[in-house]
């Protein structure tokens, strides 16, 4: 469990502190998609949390 947590922390740190992550801009033709693109990195975390909710629903069998 500790290894998985460490891997998640490393992935989040590399995503948050990479210089291209915050300063990359979409081409002007796709500017209307900016709000969607801002939310997209969070979507995998929802699946991660869903796994815990699912296991809680089946009593962690």
From Swiss-Prot:
Q: Where are the transmembrane segments?
A: 40-60
Cellular component GO terms, alphabetical: chloroplast thylakoid membrane; photosystem II reaction center
What does the entry give for GO biological process? photosynthesis
What are the alphabetically sorted keywords of the record?
Answer: Chloroplast, Membrane, Photosynthesis, Photosystem II, Plastid, Reaction center, Thylakoid, Transmembrane, Transmembrane helix
As recorded, the propeptide runs across 1-24
**Predominant subcellular localization, coarse grouping:** plastid
Can you say where in the cell this protein is located?
Plastid, Chloroplast thylakoid membrane
Pfam families, from UniProt?
A: PsbK
- Please describe what this protein does: One of the components of the core complex of photosystem II (PSII). PSII is a light-driven water:plastoquinone oxidoreductase that uses light energy to abstract electrons from H(2)O, generating O(2) and a proton gradient subsequently used for ATP formation. It consists of a core antenna complex that captures photons, and an electron transfer chain that converts photonic excitation into a charge separation.
State the family named in the UniProt similarity comment for this chain. Belongs to the PsbK family.
Name of the molecule in the record: Photosystem II reaction center protein K
Q: Which organism is it from?
A: Vitis vinifera
Biological classification of the source: Eukaryota, Viridiplantae, Streptophyta, Embryophyta, Tracheophyta
């Amino acid at each position: 469990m500790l290894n998985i947590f460490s891997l998640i922390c490393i992935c989040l740190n590399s995503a948050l502190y990479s210089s291209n992550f915050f300063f990359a801009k979409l081409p002007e033709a796709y500017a209307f998609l900016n709000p969607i693109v801002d939310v997209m990195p969070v979507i995998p975390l929802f699946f991660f949390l869903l796994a815990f909710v699912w296991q809680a629903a089946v009593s962690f069998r």
